[in-house]
Amino acid sequence: MANPYHHAVSSARKWGGEPNDYIEIHEWFDETKAHFGDFRHRALRHHTEGIWLMQSIFGRTITNSAGRVIPTRWIGEQHVTEDLGRLVTVQDWLSCMEPQPWMNRSRRLSRELERETAGVS
């Protein structure tokens, strides 16, 4: 499924209510497409940590238009499973990333700050 609306339709079929009851959550998962246009956008939120983050933003439950209380984690798990076939972790994504030299070029800020403060009385 490529479109948040289709995920929302799937949620409505599964738990009742209308697609609009679910669309904001599904749009949140897929809004990273604005920054990276292919499937790799999913590495930012389509994992178990992303589901927990979504819950902290949208709350533990929503009440759909049919009056049913739905755990938001269920909605997140549905979205990720529909896109990836299973729930994955951040480790699943990052372990597939090939490290590049620029990723590990941190500055020694502690030394720089020590030198700066040593010269100041």
Task: Show where each model-derived region lies.
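N-terminal membrane-targeting hydrophobic helices
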Residues: 1-121
